[in-house]
């Protein structure tokens, strides 16, 4: 009888722990996504402190998380390209740098696909092509045409965008 009582107590405890874990997991999965505007404001604040690459990485995480629920957001896409460009340009880690430029190119392509008539996507796509070209001679030769095309598009759309830095 003592063994039966111990078994029942153990099973009850196991059931209680398991149901608490399931409830905690369900409540964390049900949390509503933050509005993209809030995430963008947070990311812009983090970018203002970009001298600390940890802030850039935090911004990238927030933007990626938001993009998972708002894949069609132009403002998220071009900012992802911008943050990736900065990380790629300043990271001392070659692997992180290469991934940042690659991710930045993909984000820039998405931004251009979403809003072809706006300069930000073209600018940051071209910047990431340029960053990638700078670190890889093979990539650089193949991306010259893309860099030129994107920067010419920026100049056509808004000659003064980013203080005219599209004039290379």
Q: Where are the regions that the model predicts?
A:
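Bacterial N-terminal signal peptides that target proteins for export
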Residues: 1-8
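Short coil/linker segments at helix-helix boundaries
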Residues: 24-29, 34-65, 80-160, 164-168
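C-terminal motif of bacterial Sec signal peptides marking the signal peptidase cleavage site
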Residues: 16-19
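Short, flexible active-site loop motifs that bind/organize anionic cofactors or intermediates
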Residues: 10, 66, 71
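Glycine- and aromatic-enriched membrane insertion/assembly motifs of diderm outer-membrane
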Residues: 69, 73-75, 83
């Amino acid at each position: 009888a003592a063994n039966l009582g111990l078994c029942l107590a153990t099973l009850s405890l196991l059931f209680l722990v398991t149901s608490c874990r399931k409830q905690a997991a369900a409540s964390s999965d049900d949390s509503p996504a933050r509005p993209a505007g809030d995430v963008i404001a947070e990311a812009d604040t983090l970018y203002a402190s970009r001298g600390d690459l940890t802030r850039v990485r935090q911004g990238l995480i927030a933007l990626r998380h938001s993009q998972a629920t708002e894949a069609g957001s132009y403002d998220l896409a071009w900012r992802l390209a911008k943050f990736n460009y900065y990380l790629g340009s300043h990271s001392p880690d070659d692997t992180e740098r290469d991934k940042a430029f690659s991710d930045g190119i993909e984000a820039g392509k998405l931004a251009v696909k979403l809003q072809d008539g706006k300069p930000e996507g073209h600018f940051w796509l071209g910047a990431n092509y340029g960053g990638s070209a700078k670190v890889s001679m093979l990539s650089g030769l193949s991306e010259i045409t893309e860099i030129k095309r994107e920067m010419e598009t920026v100049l056509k759309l808004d000659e003064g965008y980013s203080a005219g830095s599209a004039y290379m």
